[in-house]
Structure formats: C-alpha cells, structure tokens
Amino acid sequence: MVYDFKAEIVKAKNSGSAKSGSHHWLLQRVTGIILALCSVWLIYFTLTNKNNDINIIMLWELKKPFNVVALLITVVISLYHAMLGMRVVIEDYISYHKLRNTLIIIVQLFCIVTIVAFVVALFYKG
C-alpha cells in the first residue's frame, strides 16, 4: 500500500499563515502597555478625588482637558484591546466559519457602538 505524501504537503502549503499574526501580536502588546500607563493615571485620579458625588466629578475634574483626553484614551484603547483579544479567542476556539465570522462582527460592532456612545456621553452638553 502506497501512501501519497504529496497531497498532504499541498494541503499544508495551502493552509498556511496569512502573515498578519505578527502585526496583531504587536498591536496587542502596544495596547497593553498603553493600558498599563493609563491604569496608573486612573488609579491616581480615583484615589486623589475625595468627592463621592458624580456630579462634582463631572463638573470639576472632567472640565480639565488632560483628564478628558486621558479618560478617552483609556476607554478607547481598552475596548480596542478587548476586541483584539476576543478576536483571537474566537478564531482559536470556534471552528464553524459562519459562526466565527458572525461572532467577530458582533464583537467589533459592540466595541464600536460602545466607543461612540462613550464619546457622545463625554462631550454631550445637555
């Protein structure tokens, strides 16, 4: 009995890397480093703020441009980092292609809608 190894090699060559893994890996690490730095600011902001009233925090602390920009960066980068991580988990553990693609689209839409809602809530002057 002769086994055809050529067919197995062709299958392996055609299902290779899409060459996007290193870029994705780098983005995940960069967003993680940015989140670590933003976490230091967020902890400092939380511990130094003695006001328990959210209205006072919104009126005084979030009027400072640095705090607004830092909070915006923290939320946007954390959602982007979560989107990258969830995509990897979905791609690794969901084998059914239609379900995998649907879940990736749902996660991306959720992150985009959440970012837009946060920006609108942050800058809404109502």
UniProtKB/Swiss-Prot annotation:
Kindly list the GO CC terms recorded for this protein: plasma membrane
Picking any one GO biological process from the record gives: tricarboxylic acid cycle
What membrane topology does this protein have? Multi-pass membrane protein
Q: Which cofactor does it need?
A: heme
- The segments annotated as topological domain Cytoplasmic are 1-24, 91-100
Query: Where does the chain bind heme?
Result: 81
Write out the entry's keywords from A to Z.
Cell inner membrane, Cell membrane, Electron transport, Heme, Iron, Membrane, Metal-binding, Transmembrane, Transmembrane helix, Transport, Tricarboxylic acid cycle
Name the Gene Ontology molecular function terms of this record.
electron transfer activity; heme binding; metal ion binding
Q: How is the cofactor bound?
A: The heme is bound between the two transmembrane subunits.
TM regions (residue ranges): 25-45, 69-90, 101-124
InterPro entries documented for this protein? SQR/QFR_C/D, Succ_DH_anchor, SuccDH_FuR_B_TM-su
Under the subunit heading, UniProt states: Part of an enzyme complex containing four subunits: a flavoprotein, an iron-sulfur protein, plus two membrane-anchoring proteins, SdhC and SdhD.
This protein is called: Succinate dehydrogenase hydrophobic membrane anchor subunit
Q: Give the organism the record lists.
A: Rickettsia conorii (strain ATCC VR-613 / Malish 7)
